[in-house]
Amino acid sequence: MEINRQIKESGLLNTLPSDYLDKQAYENLVKKYIVASDNFIVYRDSTKLHTIIAGYPWFSDWGRDSLIAFEGLLLISKRFKIAEEVLLTSMQKVKQGLVPNGFSEYGGKALYNSADASLLLFEAVNKYLEYTGNYDFVKNNLYAQMKSIINYYIDGITLDGNNIYLDEKDYLIVSGTDKTQNTWMDAKVNNIPVTPRNGKAVEINALWYNALRIMQKLNLKWNHIAGQVEYAYLANKCRKSFIKDFYNPNKKCLYDVIKEVKKENPKAPTIDNRYSF
């Protein structure tokens, strides 16, 4: 049976916890996991490739959700060929450096309202390499687009009001406006953001740093010295600013977002524009 083959190839039964006494119950649990995960892996006719849908009954493939689920659905179960197709699917509709965060329920138009989906793609690629070591696939099919995404984030992305760019003062990423929601907190009421997070969001900059380190690693692997130096420089600058600006010593936590505040009077006192929950 297909389910038994997938279980055997995945090696999941070898991960039986030492304190889990009922081996048969664990095997049944693994089978249920395989069956359940299969329901989210679908074939997209428009691309002739597999993709991951975000949920039932009506969600299609959402960039953020699909890429978060990527390792658990495909890599742990060793479905590497399908994993490659999902990565290729994510790349097909990239526009101005943005991976679509979803598709319209009417007509299937790509929606670009996410600052993190493109950055999550880098982590998915990194995990794929950890499981497969197939650097040739990444080099031949994904790397050029990954490089383009980084360049767009640096130079600026205006598509659909995303307002994403690198602040050259601190090498952190700014995203959004007071009218847009392009992080995971994307709820709106009457087109007004419920939790405005425009500015420098903590997870966006953590993912940005991660993406830069992954690009540094790839350039090191392929002996691209100039690229290695460039991405290391950007990552080091980002890390320094992140540690300095995002840590809240009073609450011993990270600030959630650093707002962009424009002072009318340059001599006015600086306002603490950092927010924690």
Predicted segment positions?
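Acidic/polar, glycine-enriched structural segments that form the non-catalytic walls/loops
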Residues: 1-59, 135-137, 147-155, 219-221, ...
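An acidic intrinsically disordered interaction segment
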Residues: 21-42, 80-91, 167-180, 239-244
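A short secondary-structure junction motif
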Residues: 40-44, 90-97, 156, 245, ...
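Solvent-exposed loop and edge beta-strand segments that line ligand/cofactor-binding
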Residues: 50-66, 105-118, 190-206, 256-277
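Short clusters of hydrophobic/aromatic residues that line enzyme substrate/ligand-binding pockets
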Residues: 56, 99, 173, 184, ...
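Aromatic-rich carbohydrate-recognition surfaces in CAZymes
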Residues: 60-66, 70-177, 181-182, 202-205, ...
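Catalytic cores of carbohydrate-active enzymes
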Residues: 101, 154, 158-167, 209-277
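A short, charged helix-loop
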Residues: 178-196
